[in-house]
Amino acid sequence: MRLKKMSKLFITDTILRDAHQSQAATRMRTEEMLPACEILDSMGYWSLECWGGATFDSCLRFLNEDPWERLRKLKKALPHTRLQMLFRGQNILGYKHYADDVVEQFCRKAIENGIDVIRIFDALNDIRNLESAIKFTKKYGGHCEPALSYTISPVHNEDYFVKLAKELVQMGADSICIKDMANLLLPMPAYNLVKRLKAEINVPIHLHTHNTTGTGDMTLLMAAFAGVDIVDTALSPLGNGTSQPATESLVATLKGTEYDTGLDLEKLSEAAKHFRTVADRLKRDGFLDPKVLSVDTNTLIYQVPGGMLSNLISQLKQANAEDKYYDVLAEVPRVRKDFGYPPLVTPTSQIVGSQAVLNVLAGERYKMFTKESKAVLRGEYGRLPGKVNEAVRKKAIGNDKVITCRPADLLKPELDTYRKELGDLAQSEEDVLSYALFPQVAKKFFEARRDGIVPSGADKTVSPAPASRLRALRPCTASRRARLLSRRALRASGVLAGLPPLLPFCFLLCSAAAASQSSSSAV
């Protein structure tokens, strides 16, 4: 699918995906989306982002929904609008690398079930991790939008991103996304980067940012002046703060100018009324904390994405160590430097953040490592952008050999194994893919479906427990460590929304907290 020549600023609305992922732990239900689809479909958006990211995990883990059924229902309800998803390259929607046969089948099934645009990113900007997803998206007729995971470091500058964009165009990109997940792209750098990209590559430029630091609106405006083709916004009930800038505000700002989006403010207001009731429900249930709507300039200082901030707070609450919050924020950029300056986006944001928490709570840097930190330093996630602190790497992995090839080249085909493991629980190839990404969670879902608890094809949801009903976390003791490891405790806390499955990490947090209480070591 090729784009028509751009003549105005086009809008992708994230209300059905990143808006509630960024603000409300990805807890919007399908039944809350469908009533608004008729008006959304008439809006004239370039696309609606509605799938991928953490929505897949959240559907199965928390909402008792089949994510594939959600996609099919949305496609039926939005016949005139492109549906867009976020795809983590070789990680697909999970937190590890998958073999190419799994990547191909997922691209194929996503497009068959209704996805039009696949935005593909790699946390390390390692293009080797994007090759297969790009190839298979194009093979099955999808619009391929590789993303530049934007960040700031001694190795990430304008020339770096222009070079990366050119390589992605050569690989077959239909458009290029500047993915500013941490709201670090300030207005003037945005203007300059978009200007360069428009001058040096010949595909549309799509800008994704957030409003965590309060600069998102200005960044979008300057990008529009520089000639950006498409921008991401979110309807106001779930816009701004850690989400995207509000759609209505940008539409009103540009109305009557050469950048006029063509969207109708009255229609947007009508759609917003519906999502205001959804936002109210998310607040009542404790998933939408008003804090995520405020401006937080710590992102500019510590380069920590908004969603990562909320995850750090959750982890520190688990360890009864909220007073260490600013110590952890200061430790994050130090860990990032030691790890070779990875951009802080899933899964590296969680990995770096978790290691920073461990370093602070243990009272000693790198006294313990998560297995994911070891994997990053071993090269299992791909090529790190900058120079790694070799002393830290040696402490983490000893004499293990560092992977220098494309990590997926070391993986054998996996689909047949997943099919055999799931057996009769699988009703479709889509079920096999769900199991491949989240085996324990998906299997539990399929068993419930088989037993009639989740009717096949239904999108009935389980209402999450309001925050007021959640038991307060108490200081970690030996007896509580085991309970923290239990699935029930993790699910009730909501900490796993959008996080990689770091079950052993909860135990490490408790151990580190205990060590910190008895240690006099300075951090």
What function would you assign to each model-found segment?
Residues G52-C144, L148-L164, L186:
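Active-site beta->alpha loop and helix N-cap motifs at the rims of alpha/beta catalytic domains
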Residues I11-L16, L48-C50, T81-R88, I118-R119, ...:
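Hydrophobic faces of well-ordered beta-strands that scaffold small-molecule active sites
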Residues Y160-L164, G214-A226:
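Catalytic cores of alpha/beta
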Residues D180, A226-S243:
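Glycine-rich phosphate-binding active-site loops on the catalytic face of alpha/beta enzymes
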Residues A19, I120, I176, G227, ...:
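Conserved, mostly hydrophobic/aromatic
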Residues D41-C59, D289, L293-T299, Q303-R483, ...:
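Terminal or standalone catalytic/regulatory effector modules within metabolic enzymes
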Residues R2-A24, L71:
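N-terminal amphipathic alpha-helix/helix-capping segment at the start of soluble metabolic enzymes
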